[in-house]
């Protein structure tokens, strides 16, 4: 056996011993990247879920729109990635989309919810205790499919843009007390769906 072959064998034996011994050292357990899932029961045919801090406690809460259940679920965030039992708020027929903003200037988030089957938008006002009350329904036309909040006329009050299923965009100007007045109706392309603002 040549000297080079002996050196190679010694190196391989040393490497195998080192690998074997390194497996004997106690190591830290790998981190748990995902906890077991937690399931929450909501209404029939959930269409949309959004996360927003609805009660100003700095923890994200969940809002779930249930189109077949004609309801909105509110799940208050606890702050550890879990949520309290869902509260159910009755809506109009076939709620389909929503957006969150402060519509009455009280610093508490409110909800605008498209009721596809009723042709209106429900304005649901938030309260300090994290609960909600149905304030008003605003008729917008046939088959509202999307809603977005923003100050479109620069008056400091939150307005709404609503798309209707068949080629219309409706602008509702906020009065500042949680109510809205119809401002404009625009022709849109066929089947408008979403309004990014």
Residue ranges of model-derived segments:
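Beta-strand-rich domains and repeat architectures in extracellular enzymes and scaffolds
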Residues: 40-52, 59, 67
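Glycine-aliphatic tripeptides that mark coil-to-beta-strand junctions in extracellular
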Residues: 58-60, 107-109, 156-158
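Bacterial N-terminal signal peptides
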Residues: 12-22
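Beta-propeller blade termini
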Residues: 47-56, 76, 96-105, 125, ...
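Blade-edge motifs of beta-propeller repeat domains
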Residues: 24-44, 76-93, 125-142, 173-190
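A short loop-to-beta-strand structural motif that recurs across blades of beta-propeller domains
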Residues: 71-74, 120-123, 168-172
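Hydrophobic beta-strand segments that make up the repeating blades of beta-propeller
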Residues: 50, 62-66, 111-114, 160-163
